[in-house]
């Protein structure tokens, strides 16, 4: 089966907005063992849309079309599909009623232009959009099925999961001999990882791919065919031996997702005190439902006074060692843990930049501590000073990995490769 994607919209084509839908879609389908083999972006011009629908429908088996289903004059995907196939547009009575009910429930008067969203090519199969007013639909044209979705990200993603993936599986054999394994890494760049893994001789039908999503690089091991699948365990063993501590999670999108799962299963609690990360640790954790079962509190103690008054950091510790120090961050972690008698206290304090660094503590210097009921683990690391956001996100990731390793009973302080460490 050959899957393709057509993205529509002048703002996407002109780079005025980043097309996150396309990247998300390709990654989501890869998780299903289905590769998106081509992606085309086209603007809001009727003749261009017609041309690309005709061209790609001769090559692909199924095409997901994203965008252009709204009520405005530049939403042209539906009209273009009808013209490409030589069909008229027909009002779908079910969707018209859905629109009228939706506006009635919201207490709003429906503008006449919204009825455009109920017009579909005459051969189209209506596809439900459970969270929006733009009607999805599917059309068989030449050799391909074209499946139309709205551009609004949360509508698009829900339709992919609830409508598109089942649609594909009903019509195509996607249970073929494919398998995917993913490894989330920390502390090494994409080129460094690739140089290391190039030493592995891959069997026919197996490929290694890389996806950068700072502060992580995701490695994807993709196998096609029984022969390649049978050798996945062998290749995975080689990958783990070569990368060692750089691998921080399997089949997860982020370290926060891994930490969330581990804490939910462990029945243990966490308090967090953040300075340079500014709430990033807690923000990532509470994006997951159920985080209240383990997260006691998140404190952003940015100034020295708050470190003293809220966390109980000794003034003399700050005077002697400074805010960015092992001594200070250990007291922050212990103080955060003690407030609610949490099982763990996690703390960060650093210099995110671009200003504030010194010769002894340059930008990118970050102290991190993990307090447990038995003691405290701490380290002061040297991070690349490319941007403030990168320092904060890398600090968050290292803090998460310290906690992950403690939860798994592993060594908490480890070397990652490109992340340096100050001697205590």
From Swiss-Prot:
The domain of life is Bacteria
Pfam families found in the cross-reference section? CinA, MoCF_biosynth
Question: What's this protein's family per the entry?
Answer: Belongs to the CinA family.
Q: What is this protein called?
A: CinA-like protein
Q: Provide the organism lineage as a comma list.
A: Bacteria, Pseudomonadati, Pseudomonadota, Gammaproteobacteria, Alteromonadales
């Amino acid at each position: 089966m050959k899957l393709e994607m057509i993205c529509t919209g002048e703002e996407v084509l002109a780079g005025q907005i980043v097309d996150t839908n396309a990247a998300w879609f390709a990654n989501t389908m890869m998780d299903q063992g289905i590769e998106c083999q081509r992606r085309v972006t086209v603007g809001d011009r009727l003749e261009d849309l017609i041309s690309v629908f005709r061209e790609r429908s001769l090559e692909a088996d199924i095409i997901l079309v994203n965008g252009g289903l709204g009520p405005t004059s530049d939403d042209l995907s539906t009209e273009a599909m009808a013209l490409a196939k030589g069909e008229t547009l027909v009002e779908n009575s079910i969707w018209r009623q859905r629109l009228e009910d939706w506006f009635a429930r919201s207490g709003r008067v429906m503008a006449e232009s919204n009825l455009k969203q109920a017009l579909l090519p005459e051969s189209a199969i209506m596809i439900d959009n459970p969270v929006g007013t733009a009607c999805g639909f599917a059309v068989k044209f030449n050799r391909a099925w074209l499946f139309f979705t709205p551009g609004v990200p949360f509508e698009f993603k829900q339709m992919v999961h609830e409508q598109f993936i089942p649609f594909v599986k009903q019509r195509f054999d996607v249970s073929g001999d494919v398998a995917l394994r993913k490894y989330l890494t920390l502390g090494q760049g994409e080129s460094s990882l690739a140089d290391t893994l190039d030493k592995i001789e891959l069997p026919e039908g197996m490929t290694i791919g890389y996806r950068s999503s700072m502060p992580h690089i995701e490695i994807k091991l993709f196998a096609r065919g029984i022969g390649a699948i049978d050798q996945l365990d062998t290749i995975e063993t080689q990958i783990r031996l070569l990368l060692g501590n750089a691998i921080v999670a399997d089949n997860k999108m982020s370290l926060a997702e891994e930490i969330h799962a581990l804490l939910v299963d462990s029945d243990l609690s966490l308090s967090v005190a953040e300075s340079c990360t500014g709430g990033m640790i807690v923000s990532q954790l509470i994006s997951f439902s159920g985080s209240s079962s383990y997260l006691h509190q998140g404190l952003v103690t940015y100034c020295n006074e708050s470190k003293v008054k809220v966390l109980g950091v000794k003034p003399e510790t700050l005077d002697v060692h400074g805010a960015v120090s092992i001594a200070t961050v250990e007291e922050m972690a212990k103080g955060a843990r003690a407030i609610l008698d949490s099982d763990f206290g996690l703390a960060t304090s650093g210099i995110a930049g671009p200003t504030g660094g010194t010769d002894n503590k340059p930008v990118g210097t970050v102290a991190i501590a993990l307090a447990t009921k038995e003691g405290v683990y701490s380290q002061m690391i040297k991070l690349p000073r490319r941007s403030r956001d990168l320092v904060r996100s890398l600090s968050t990731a290292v803090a998460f990995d310290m906690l992950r390793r403690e939860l798994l009973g592993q060594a908490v302080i480890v070397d990652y490769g490109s992340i340096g460490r100050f001697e205590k």
